[in-house]
A protein has these predicted regions:
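Alpha-helical scaffold segments that mediate packing/assembly in large oligomeric complexes
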Residues: 145, 149-164, 168-225
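Short gly/pro-enriched beta-turn/loop segments at secondary-structure junctions
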Residues: 228, 233-237
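Conserved short secondary-structure elements within globular domains
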Residues: 111-122, 145, 219-220, 294-302
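Intrinsically disordered, low-complexity terminal tails
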Residues: 1-66, 332-338
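Assembly/oligomerization interface modules of large self-assembling protein complexes
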Residues: 54-143
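Sequence/fold signature of self-assembling virion shell proteins
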Residues: 201-205, 209, 213, 217-224, ...
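Short, solvent-exposed loop/turn segments at the edges of secondary structure
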Residues: 140-144, 235, 311
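Exposed beta-sheet edge/beta-hairpin loop segments within beta-rich domains
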Residues: 135, 156-158, 232
Length: 338
């Protein structure tokens, strides 16, 4: 029982995951012992079975698959988090019930204005105003890959190749998600009012290369954009999202302007050259949503997977269900000449 309790942490440690408070036995275990324990927990040892045959039987059990998956999940999540750190700072999660297309409705956070009350005045009832949300239906995308651990790997207690694959898939999921975020920004979709998200009329376009003057005008536009209820949004610039070729300039510009404590640079590799976006804090005005399957407990799912019998291996499936969408046209200014 103690071996099984320590097994997932043992796998996680072996593949290089950072494990907080690992089981005391985690470091001393090897894969062969884990596989044999899984076999014996499922069915007692038969008289004719050798150590190797017990190990082989254990590799085919659901228990061994779940152990591999639990250990691999920790590394996949950590590599995903490291790679996704930038785009997750300026996006917000949005739960969807299933994989069917869904419309995202944006409620205007400033749509109902508080009113000054006189003495004994009646408090008026406000009605939430729907913002011009994305009229295009969006949906979750599923990215997945199977990874196996061979009998030789188990015998040799060697998880280097497995570790490299799992870590790579966690990072790959984050890169694919970032690409969807970039496409959501660049798509300039039609909103619910029939007009495109970005246009001069919406006070959210600065069609010039990034420099101090352009940044200043974009900051002013965030302040002066109008909510659907007609209020000045008064939004403070929080994130400067740029294409890779603009990153150094963006960081130098913020440093020279004394804005490094106010505005944070984030880079999206899939943006066209010269592109930049200035966004408000997503807590004040969410603009870009990253889709998640409702009820999912993790951004990356790692599940046991039965490998083809001829491969003589145990396996896991690394899966990411994600998507991205532009939620509203306020709280963002698009810059660049691309």
């Amino acid at each position: 029982a103690e071996i099984l309790a320590a097994a997932a942490d043992s796998v996680a440690v072996a593949i290089g995951a950072r494990v907080k408070n690992p089981h005391p036995l985690a470091v001393g275990l090897n894969l062969q012992t884990i596989a044999q324990t899984c076999a014996l927990a499922t069915q007692p040892r038969r008289e004719w079975e050798t150590e190797m045959s017990v190990m082989g039987r254990g590799m085919n059990t659901d228990l061994f698959g779940k152990t591999l998956a639990a250990g691999a999940r920790q590394l996949a999540l950590q590599t995903y988090d490291a790679q996704a750190a930038e785009h997750l700072t300026f996006t917000v999660p949005f739960d969807v019930k299933n994989f069917n297309p869904v419309e995202i409705v944006a409620a205007d956070a400033q749509g109902v204005a508080l009113e000054l009350l006189g003495e004994n005045a009646e408090v008026a009832t406000g009605v939430a105003i729907l913002d011009a949300g994305n009229a295009t239906e969006v949906r979750l995308h599923t990215f997945a890959k199977n990874v196996g651990v061979s009998r030789r790997d188990v015998v040799n207690d060697d998880l280097q190749l497995f570790s490299a694959f799992v870590a790579g898939l966690g990072g790959s999921a984050a890169r694919l998600e970032a690409e969807l975020v970039a496409k959501a920004l660049e798509g300039n979709p039609l909103m619910d009012d029939g007009a495109q998200a970005f246009a001069e009329a919406h006070n959210n376009v600065e069609a010039v290369a990034l420099d101090a003057e352009a940044l200043g005008r974009a900051m002013a536009k965030l302040r002066n954009q109008r909510t659907p209820s007609g209020q000045l949004a008064g939004l403070r610039a929080r994130f400067l999202v740029v294409a890779p070729d603009v990153e150094f300039l963006a960081r130098q510009l913020l440093k020279d302007s004394g804005l490094t404590d106010v505005v944070t640079v984030a880079v999206l590799a899939n943006l066209p050259e010269g592109r930049w976006y200035l966004l408000a804090d997503p807590l004040a005005c969410p603009v870009v949503a990253v889709l998640r399957l409702a009820g999912s407990t993790s951004r990356i799912l790692v599940e046991p997977h039965k490998m083809p019998i001829h491969t003589d291996s145990a396996g896991v499936r690394v899966r990411c269900d994600t998507g991205a969408a532009l939620v509203r046209r306020q709280g963002i200014v698009r810059g660049g000449t691309a």
